[in-house]
């Protein structure tokens, strides 16, 4: 049985398997019959997430979509055939592959039907409630059964870790996207308030309270309850899984969108309750879907990745990057999906987030910009080829192979010797509860993160709870909550104490645009690499740029370095403090500093 853990080297987390460090780059697909396993194996990849679910009920309770043709526990006798076949297919091609089961903890139909009180209504039928103790109990038993099968199988010796998913879209969101609002949910909320605040007869909210701009104590407390409940559920299953695998391998969870999702009723603002869990080794979320993943902006992180690393965890980011080969889901699996959801174009003919670039050239740029962002931040990547066939192109695969090699080579670079972010952006997770649900103030985090991406100034994202540990490293701080929590207020006080210039939103000025952010930062001594609106990536001895228009660009380094082009540029290695090149609109270039 393989042993795995997260180990840091030169400030960057790696997956250590049987004492050997591995750069966290992996591949997965929802449609295994169209999986490009051979392509990625031939490109040097050895890590593979393999999806498996307790049920084939929808993962999206609005559209009714599920990628799962079968659920392990939907039959009288557990059916592991599809999962086993995929694992064996990969190992036949690459006997030394590392397999990571990606387990969807979702209760089968029979359980849902037999326990209506433990469920919550959704547009496509009832599903298990995050509040349900019975769900946690019975779900853990099913998880144990599945894991026992995996650990007793003929491929057990290649299992290197696990990822736990659940809730809506497998991202541990409440199935109803409304805080598991039900009779049982409200009863659990009453107990929560009684135990936490000593209130013998707590008021409970109505649905209308969350839709009319109300923000009273009861509403705010229910929002906190939603997030703590989701976090408790995630931690419960992670703890159980660690027990079942005798703490021998890493466990990750798909959770934590506090820098992207602004609705606390989804349950995703509970990272502060999980970040120190001894049962969770890595966190995953997609790179952000800002502007429908259009070019010209940074596809940033949905959670405070710098905080996750500070607490000894790996950020293993889903990069579901569409390409010129991305097809309609219905065409990729003919006859399976009759409704036209996840279409490539909307009713007005505009591209949706499901549509890829028109050309292989722009597809290369998309992969490069996603890779550059994660490379400089020391995060892992799993390329999510959702419907299969997205990367089946020799040009794309050549780049993906080079990325794998670079990620491995970067292990030896001492990141402290190279330029890094001088700006900290703070996410105040608890501050969402201070605002009416859906109000403009709740969008400030996402808008600020997006605007920062075009300042030409690198930045790190931390939770306000970590301010005392990290502020001394930065020249300036950006806050994102007009109505801060106590943690946010404490972080602001620390800025004053350490004489760190801080940009503070308030009710009169809740949001700052790109130019305002750039001006504030440069006026306070922060180095700007490019002031023309291009996206800049910098860290760990690498620099990248994503161009917003055609023309000559200059990347101004803070000192002179030997520069080696890696992607998107062709010139001899040279020593310079100004990288100059001509770039086409929406192309991406990446360089190594030596």
What label would you give each PLM region?
Residues 1-41:
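N-terminal carbohydrate-binding accessory modules
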Residues 235, 243, 247, 281-283, ...:
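Carbohydrate-binding surfaces of carbohydrate-active enzymes
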Residues 34-122, 233-245:
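Aromatic-lined substrate-binding rim segments of carbohydrate-active enzymes
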Residues 104-106, 112-290, 298-299, 304:
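Polysaccharide-binding and catalytic clefts of secreted carbohydrate-active enzymes
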Residues 23-27, 48-50, 99-103, 160-164, ...:
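Hydrophobic faces of well-ordered beta-strands that scaffold small-molecule active sites
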Residues 29-42, 145-149, 262-276, 363-371, ...:
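Short, acidic/polar
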Residues 37-44, 86-96, 154, 272-278, ...:
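Acidic (Asp/Glu)-rich catalytic clusters
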Residues 21-30, 51-81, 121-141, 149, ...:
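The substrate-binding groove and active-site-proximal loops of carbohydrate-active enzymes
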């Amino acid at each position: 049985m393989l042993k795995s853990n997260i180990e840091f080297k030169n400030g960057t987390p790696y997956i250590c398997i049987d004492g050997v460090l591995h750069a966290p780059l992996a591949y997965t697909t929802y449609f295994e019959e169209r999986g490009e396993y051979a392509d990625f194996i031939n490109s040097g990849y050895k890590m593979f997430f393999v999806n498996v679910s307790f049920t084939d009920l929808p993962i999206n309770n609005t559209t009714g979509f599920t990628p799962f043709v079968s659920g392990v526990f939907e039959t009288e006798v557990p059916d592991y055939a599809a999962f086993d076949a995929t694992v064996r297919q990969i190992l036949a091609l690459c006997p030394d592959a590392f397999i990571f089961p990606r387990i969807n903890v979702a209760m089968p139909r029979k359980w849902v039907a037999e326990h209506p009180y433990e469920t919550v209504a959704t547009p496509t039928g009832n599903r298990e409630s995050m509040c349900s103790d019975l769900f946690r109990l019975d779900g853990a038993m099913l998880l144990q059964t599945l894991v026992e099968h995996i650990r007793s199988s003929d491929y057990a010796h290649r299992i290197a870790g696990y990822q736990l998913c659940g809730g809506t879209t497998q991202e541990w969101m409440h199935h109803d996207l409304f805080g598991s609002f039900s009779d049982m949910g409200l009863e659990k909320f009453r107990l929560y308030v009684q135990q936490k605040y000593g209130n013998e007869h707590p008021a409970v909210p109505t649905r209308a309270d969350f839709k009319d701009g109300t923000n009273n104590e009861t509403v705010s407390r229910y929002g906190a309850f939603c997030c703590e409940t989701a976090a408790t559920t995630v931690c419960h299953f992670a703890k159980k899984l660690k027990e079942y695998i005798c703490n021998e391998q890493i466990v990750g969870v798909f959770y934590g969108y506090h820098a992207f999702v602004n609705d606390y009723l989804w349950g995703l603002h509970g990272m502060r309750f999980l970040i120190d869990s001894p049962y969770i080794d890595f966190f995953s979320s997609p790179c952000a879907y800002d502007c429908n993943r259009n070019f010209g902006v940074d596809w940033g992180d949905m959670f405070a990745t710098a905080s996750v690393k500070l607490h000894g965890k790996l950020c293993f980011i889903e990069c579901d990057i569409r390409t010129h080969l991305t097809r309609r889901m219905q065409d990729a699996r003919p006859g399976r999906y009759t409704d036209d959801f996840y279409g490539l174009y909307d009713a007005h003919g505009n591209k949706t987030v499901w549509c890829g670039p028109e050309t292989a050239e722009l597809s290369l740029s998309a992969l490069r910009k996603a890779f550059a962002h994660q490379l400089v931040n020391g995060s892992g990547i799993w390329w999510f080829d959702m419907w299969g066939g997205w990367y089946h192109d020799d040009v794309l695969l050549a780049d993906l192979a080079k990325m794998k090699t670079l990620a491995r080579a970067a292990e030896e670079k001492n990141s402290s010797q190279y330029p890094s972010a001088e700006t900290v952006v703070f996410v105040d997770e608890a501050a969402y509860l201070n605002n009416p649900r859906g109000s403009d103030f709740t969008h400030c985090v996402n808008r600020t993160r997006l605007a920062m991406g075009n300042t030409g100034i690198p930045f790190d994202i931390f939770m306000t709870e970590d301010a005392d540990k990290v502020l001394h490293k930065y020249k300036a701080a950006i806050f994102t909550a007009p109505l801060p929590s106590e943690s946010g207020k404490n972080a602001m006080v620390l800025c004053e104490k350490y004489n760190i210039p801080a940009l503070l939103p308030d009710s009169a000025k809740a949001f700052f645009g790109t130019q305002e952010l750039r001006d504030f930062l440069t006026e306070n001594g922060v180095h700007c690499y490019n002031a023309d609106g291009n996206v800049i990536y910098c860290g760990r001895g690498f620099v990248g740029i994503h161009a917003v228009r055609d023309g000559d660009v200059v990347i101004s380094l803070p000192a002179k370095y030997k520069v080696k082009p890696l992607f998107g540029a062709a010139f001899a290695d040279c020593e310079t403090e100004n990288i100059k090149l001509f770039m086409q609109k929406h192309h991406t270039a990446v360089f190594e500093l030596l």
